[in-house]
Amino acid sequence: MKYPILLALLMAATVAQAASSQEYVFKDQPFESGSLSTDGKEFSISTVSSRGNLCDLGGRLKNNIYRDDEGCEIHFAFSGNKVRVTTPETAREACSKYCGFNAYFTDDYYRLPAACTETAAKNSEQRFQTAYRAKQYTQAAQIKQQYLNACNSFMFITEQMRARNDLAVAYKNSGNKTACRAALQPLRRHWSDKAEHHSYVYRDAFMKELAAAKFNWNACR
């Protein structure tokens, strides 16, 4: 995926992990981001809250538990494509030192689908742009729709908005105004949002995509 700045910061912490590590991320949390990388022996976690505050931690696991020397204890429960990260109540204060104000890392993390990796997303975008520039608008819309169907739950809000705007324009140019409006419908809940409602971290990009969505909606009526 094309991550915004805060996601780029988040992912940078996991670059040093071994190639065999699995990558897990937050799901259905479009205003927050979280990344867990682990090979079962070591782990690295980075999260960014909706206000731009971070958690950053890592270490060695023993029986799927991490303990530092200062009372922090973290449990990892692996189940299929999901990892649940928890801390005992008695360890929460000690673990809070890894996070900024109101940031957290205890949550469910989901394995990122193959279609949603950065490489796959770049390939999908290239195919979309190639089809769009060739005026193959129906094909371009199909490519973008498939990507959204697979990856929407794992995308940051501004990514979702950008992808839906691209999809809407492709549908409009293909002559399918009904599908154009359907692509934008999930964004209409934000129609009345003001800049001050959102964090400085993504505010400018959010308002830019919101303005584009409103313009595209009117163009598809």
Indicate where each model-derived feature is located:
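TPR/TPR-like alpha-solenoid helical repeat scaffolds
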Residues: 158-169, 193-221
